[in-house]
């Protein structure tokens, strides 16, 4: 019901419990996403974002997922030279392709259906498109599923991340942003463990590059996401 209301552009208001009484029922307060966050709103330096993304070649893995698809929409607003979008799910990737053609026809976008675990395919993509920045959002994320399929969790999340990180250094990517999860904090399940291993690997690789042990200039950054609030095509991230 709430999704249907929001889809029609109807705004929802909610009073606090202290205000909700017979005398103050008309004193309503608008509810925003920020009201749900247990922290202060983060201020973003938009000039730096524009300078980073404008006219650059951006590779996004997991581009058809809940986080990856919203990254595609947000990054496309800043006029990158090209988006290289990778996902193994054919149907949602096709939806992303149609969305880009409709909403951002001026942006060159390559929608590629493949797995990040194919080293030869990933190397071909890096060699062909030479991305400036990589946003790595591809991962198996459902905890119960990964408990029952631990080998696939390690294969996709860990091995796939290693392939991408190594290729980023090899092909001169400026910055590699890995999307992780709050479940990597003192992990108690297979999925969380797999993402923590990924964090340790890219952190170690970043240190090795800085110290000259590994030749390259790539900077590695990890960001942890908590829950994702999804309202149809509108995703709001809870960091």
Q: Residue ranges of each PLM-predicted region?
A:
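N-terminal Rossmann NAD(P)H-binding glycine-rich loop of SDR-like oxidoreductase domains
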Residues: 57-78
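Conserved Rossmann-fold NAD(P)-dependent oxidoreductase catalytic core, especially the SDR/UDP-sugar
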Residues: 8, 23, 130, 136, ...
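Conserved beta-loop-beta element that borders a ligand/cofactor-binding pocket
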Residues: 203-234
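Short beta-strand element of Class I
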Residues: 81-84
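Glycine/proline-rich active-site loop of Rossmann-fold NAD(P)-dependent oxidoreductases
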Residues: 190, 196, 229-237
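Conserved Rossmann-fold cofactor-binding substructure of NAD(P)-dependent oxidoreductases
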Residues: 110-133
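Helix N-cap at the beta1-alpha1 junction of Rossmann-like dinucleotide-binding domains, i.e.
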Residues: 87-92, 116
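Flexible, Lys/Arg-rich cytosolic regulatory linkers and terminal tails that connect or flank
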Residues: 2-57, 169
